Each structure stands twice: as C-alpha cells, then as structure tokens.
Amino acid sequence: MKALSKLKAEEGIWMTDVPVPELGHNDLLIKIRKTAICGTDVHIYNWDEWSQKTIPVPMVVGHEYVGEVVGIGQEVKGFKIGDRVSGEGHITCGHCRNCRGGRTHLCRNTIGVGVNRPGCFAEYLVIPAFNAFKIPDNISDDLASIFDPFGNAVHTALSFDLVGEDVLVSGAGPIGIMAAAVAKHVGARNVVITDVNEYRLELARKMGITRAVNVAKENLNDVMAELGMTEGFDVGLEMSGAPPAFRTMLDTMNHGGRIAMLGIPPSDMSIDWTKVIFKGLFIKGIYGREMFETWYKMAALIQSGLDLSPIITHRFSIDDFQKGFDAMRSGQSGKVILSWD
C-alpha cells in the first residue's frame, strides 16, 4: 500500500510502498479516506530535536484521519464493515492505576499513533477497536478528519465553566482558534485571541471570535478597556507555548482566574510565581483528549451548530502531499487536508 513515511534521519517525508498492517483479534482495519497534517507531523518533517529523540526510523507517520472499517478482529464487538470512523491517537495500556480508574487520558504508558507506532498517512491503518469512534452521518469527512486536534481544543476549552466568562486564548494556531470558537459557542462573554501571525488572526475573525489581537501592533490592556473589562480575564487557554504570551496571560488574569495549558514551551520557562500565588490562580495541564467524553462533546458541538469549516484552508490529493507540507510549514494556513480517495 502507499504510505508517507519518515525514511531517513533528516528533513523530509517520503512516499513509500509498505505492507498492509496485520489485523489483530481486538483491532479494526480502516481504509483511510482523508487525513490532516498536524503540527507534530511538521516537527517530524523538520526532524527537530524532539523528533530525533522520539521517532523511530523508518516509520509511517500521521494521526489525524477519517476512514471506513474494512476488517474486524474476531474479538471485536460493536462495529461493522462500512462504519465510518476516526480514532483516538493515544493507545493506552489498560493496566495502570489511571487506566483502571477511568482516567485513560492520563495513562503513563501511552503510545502515539504515527509517533511510536505506524500511523494513518497510508491507505490502511490498524488500531485497537477500543480507540475507534463512529462518526455520525451528519458530520463531513473533512471535519471528522480533524477530530484529533479539535479534541485538544475541546478538552482545553471545556476544562472550566465558561458561561458568562471573559476568556483569553494565547496562540492562534488551528487548535487555539478552535478552542476560542468552542468558548464562544458555549456561552463565554468575551473571547480574545492573541498572536503575531496576521493570517491566522484573520482566520479567527472568520470564526466569530470577539477580538483577534496582534500583540505586535495592539496593547492587550487597551483591548480589555475597549471591551469594558475592568478586572481581568476569568479563564486563560494557553495554546502557544510562547513564554512571553504566558507571562502576558498571568499579568491580565483576574484574581481567582483559571488557566488551562496545552502549548508546549520550547525549553525551561521562567515566570513571576508571585502573580500565581497572590492572584490565587489555578493552572491545569492538558494532554490529549478525555476518552471518550471529549469525543462525544466534539460531535455534539458540531451537531449543535458550531461551524469549524473556516479552519480548513487547504485540500490536496495525497499525490500532492509535498504541497500540503509546504502550506503547513509556511505558517499561512489553517488545517490542511490530504485526500486518499
């Protein structure tokens, strides 16, 4: 079968021919329809320090997808041939304390599809049936293919009660924009998103965010005054991993504010901890998606009218995968979809 693989320990990704993966007793064989390129895939393409320490070579990569069930392991129940599915990219052990306690998203032995085991940038993918999620008929293939990053956004945004709250989102990448859209959809009062990338801030405006602020050109305190905010933000969603953005968030949070952090800083990050202490801030780290509560919430949000379509900006045939990676690496894109049909 055709597959995109990390063949060499250097920059790039390559189209290869690999065997169709073997179906285990508890697995599903999925024929891939569409995949989306994640920031993680760009890290792997660039072969940065994280990738060099993490990714085995050679390996099929990718973890954002939608496809059709074409094979079912003999122990699997609840699925049938032809079911349209996406899937949770974190394969958990089932045996650690968190798994046995129902907190599978916190499994200490998590293995990543397309990171530690063969991924979805291929004509076929095998995953445990436990990890598959059936896609409702009224959700398109395009949207289903980005459920993985949408899940990061939903998990982060819905960490706290947002109704009537003022929310600051730092980082207008696709996940940050989707998190801001979720916050607005579920009843936040003001949702402000910050970045320095004007292309992505314009995407946020198309998604109906209250204010998309280029912090290289505008002062966040001026924006808060314009919105009639006198006490600071109630909820912060840190999606950028940029130390200056997190420090600004700490500066502008209200006392008793709550922060969910998904963005990964590039290295050690120094902050003024007295602001955390004296403001009584609550900071929560976010990893992946809650299994599978986040997935049900994703489907319900879309079915209740949340429109994510502006975030998908580029579509290519898999034969033009290089154009897709070029678009992602340029910073001038939202989500990029690769079609395998």
From Swiss-Prot:
| Cofactor section | Zn(2+)
Residues the record marks as site: Important for catalytic activity for the proton relay mechanism but does not participate directly in the coordination of zinc atom? 148
Q: Which reaction does it catalyse?
A: L-threonine + NAD(+) = (2S)-2-amino-3-oxobutanoate + NADH + H(+)
Extract the InterPro entries matched here: ADH-like_C, ADH-like_N, ADH_Zn_CS, GroES-like_sf, L-Threonine_3-DHase, NAD(P)-bd_dom_sf, PKS_ER, Zn_alcohol_dh
Question: Which EC numbers does the record give?
Answer: 1.1.1.103
Pfam families attached to this UniProt entry: ADH_N (PF08240), ADH_zinc_N (PF00107)
The answer to whether UniProt assigns keyword Heme to this entry is no
Pathway listed: Amino-acid degradation; L-threonine degradation via oxydo-reductase pathway; glycine from L-threonine: step 1/2
* Chain sites annotated for binding Zn(2+) 2: 93, 96, 99, 107
Q: How is the cofactor bound?
A: Binds 2 Zn(2+) ions per subunit.
Q: Which UniProt keywords apply?
A: Cytoplasm, Metal-binding, NAD, Oxidoreductase, Zinc
Q: Where is the active site?
A: 40 (charge relay system), 43 (charge relay system)
Q: Which GO terms describe its cellular component?
A: cytoplasm
Which residues hold NAD(+)?
175, 195, 200, 262-264, 286-287
Q: Give the UniProt subcellular location, in the record's own words.
A: Cytoplasm
Q: What class of enzyme is it?
A: oxidoreductase
Is the keyword Metal-binding in the record? yes
* GO molecular function terms noted in the UniProt entry: L-threonine 3-dehydrogenase activity; zinc ion binding
**Similarity comment text for this entry:** Belongs to the zinc-containing alcohol dehydrogenase family.
Q: What HAMAP family has UniProt attached to this entry?
A: Thr_dehydrog
Physiological role: Catalyzes the NAD(+)-dependent oxidation of L-threonine to 2-amino-3-ketobutyrate.
Q: What is this protein called?
A: L-threonine 3-dehydrogenase
Q: What is the lineage of its organism?
A: Bacteria, Pseudomonadati, Pseudomonadota, Gammaproteobacteria, Enterobacterales
Gene behind the chain: tdh
